[in-house]
């Protein structure tokens, strides 16, 4: 094969540290952090706040490995368009610091390691869910939809919604309705999280013919879609409180406040869809939203929290009884 910018040999002068950094960058570690947060939330809610620390550590480790595998394959598949876009052309594959076959071997090793370790230390269901996440992200999003549909991030977003299922299955060995609500929360959250970012970098997507919604439909229709998803997201988060009773009032109150703020910010974007600062504000808040929401799930699930809430409730009932 004729040598191109995408098939140049890796420089023999790279230090061990640079080589390790290359593979670390292939995994897109900043994306993995959010996956691990939602995995932990699933575990803590499923276990009512009493999670085996060893199981938690292993599940988070294998989750990071599985996500790293999926992200590496994504980098491998997209290396042609990454080379064209200025913000991505210096990544390990388009820059030639890592060869395609090396990235593929690395991705396979991560996937095999994740599946084996999770099966041995947790259970087969959670391990299979990790592999399903890889399959959906690579097959459905990266290969099928990313370059062909404006709904790429909506349908492909199912991959990012799988981590809480992994966490839940690791603890219980099954998937309850509450687990699927966690899946739905992440699934519905993904478009209003990603589309504001797509609005900011739509010129890059247009350059490489990736049909992200802002590129094809424009900023205003995209802003309305973002607003619509935030409206659906708020009641979905509250399903964990009622009727499922998987989370309590502390989580419910925080989810309500977060949801209202998210809706307000999305509405402000509808008013000024061409305002890049507003799109950036929605994107940044979406990350904060998910981090606080998952933290609220974890705190609400703790036995200490249940004890405090029960005691406060009992005291209030006694006070009301005394007054009446």
From Swiss-Prot:
Q: Name one GO cellular component term.
A: plasma membrane
Q: Which reaction does it catalyse?
A: heme b + (2E,6E)-farnesyl diphosphate + H2O = Fe(II)-heme o + diphosphate
Topology of this chain in the membrane: Multi-pass membrane protein
UniProt pathway = Porphyrin-containing compound metabolism; heme O biosynthesis; heme O from protoheme: step 1/1
Please give the start and end residues of each transmembrane region: 31-51, 53-73, 104-124, 125-145, 153-173, 181-201, 222-242, 243-263, 285-305
Q: What class of enzyme is it?
A: transferase
**GO biological process entries:** heme O biosynthetic process
Would you say which domain of life the source belongs to? Bacteria
Record key words, sorted: Cell inner membrane, Cell membrane, Heme biosynthesis, Membrane, Transferase, Transmembrane, Transmembrane helix
- Where does the record place it? Cell inner membrane
- Entry EC number(s): 2.5.1.141
Miscellaneous comment: Carbon 2 of the heme B porphyrin ring is defined according to the Fischer nomenclature.
The similarity annotation says: Belongs to the UbiA prenyltransferase family. Protoheme IX farnesyltransferase subfamily.
Say what the protein does.
Converts heme B (protoheme IX) to heme O by substitution of the vinyl group on carbon 2 of heme B porphyrin ring with a hydroxyethyl farnesyl side group.
Name of the protein described by the UniProt record: Protoheme IX farnesyltransferase
Q: Which organism is it from?
A: Cyanothece sp. (strain PCC 7425 / ATCC 29141)
Highest lineage ranks of the organism? Bacteria, Bacillati, Cyanobacteriota, Cyanophyceae, Gomontiellales
């Amino acid at each position: 094969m004729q040598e191109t910018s995408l098939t140049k040999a890796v420089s023999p002068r790279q230090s061990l540290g640079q080589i390790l950094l290359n593979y670390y960058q292939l995994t897109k570690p900043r994306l993995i952090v959010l996956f691990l947060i939602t995995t932990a939330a699933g575990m803590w809610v499923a276990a009512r706040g009493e999670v085996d620390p060893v199981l938690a550590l292993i599940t988070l480790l294998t989750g990071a490995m599985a996500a790293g595998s999926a992200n590496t394959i994504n980098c491998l598949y997209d290396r042609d368009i990454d080379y064209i876009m200025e913000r991505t052309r210096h990544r390990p594959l388009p820059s030639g610091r890592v060869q395609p076959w090396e990235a593929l071997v690395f991705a396979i090793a991560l996937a095999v390691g994740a599946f084996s370790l999770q099966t041995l230390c947790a259970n087969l269901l959670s391990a299979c869910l990790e592999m399903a996440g890889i399959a959906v992200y690579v097959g459905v999003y990266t290969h099928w939809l990313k370059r062909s549909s404006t709904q790429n991030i909506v349908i492909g977003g199912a991959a990012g919604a799988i981590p809480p299922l992994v966490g839940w299955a690791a603890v219980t060995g099954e998937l309850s309705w509450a687990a699927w609500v966690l899946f739905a929360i992440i699934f519905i959250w993904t478009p209003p999280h990603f589309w504001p970012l797509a609005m900011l970098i739509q010129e890059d997507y247009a350059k490489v013919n990736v049909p992200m919604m802002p590129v094809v439909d424009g900023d205003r229709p995209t802003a309305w879609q973002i607003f619509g998803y935030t409206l659906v997201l708020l009641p979905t988060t509250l399903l964990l409180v009622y009727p499922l009773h998987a989370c309590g009032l502390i989580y419910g109150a925080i989810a309500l406040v977060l949801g209202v703020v998210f809706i307000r910010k999305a509405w402000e974007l509808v008013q000024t869809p061409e305002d890049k600062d507003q799109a950036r504000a929605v994107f940044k808040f979406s990350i904060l939203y998910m981090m606080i929401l998952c933290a609220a799930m974890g705190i609400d699930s703790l036995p200490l929290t249940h004890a405090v809430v029960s005691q406060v409730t009992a005291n209030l009932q006694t006070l009301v009884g005394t007054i009446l």
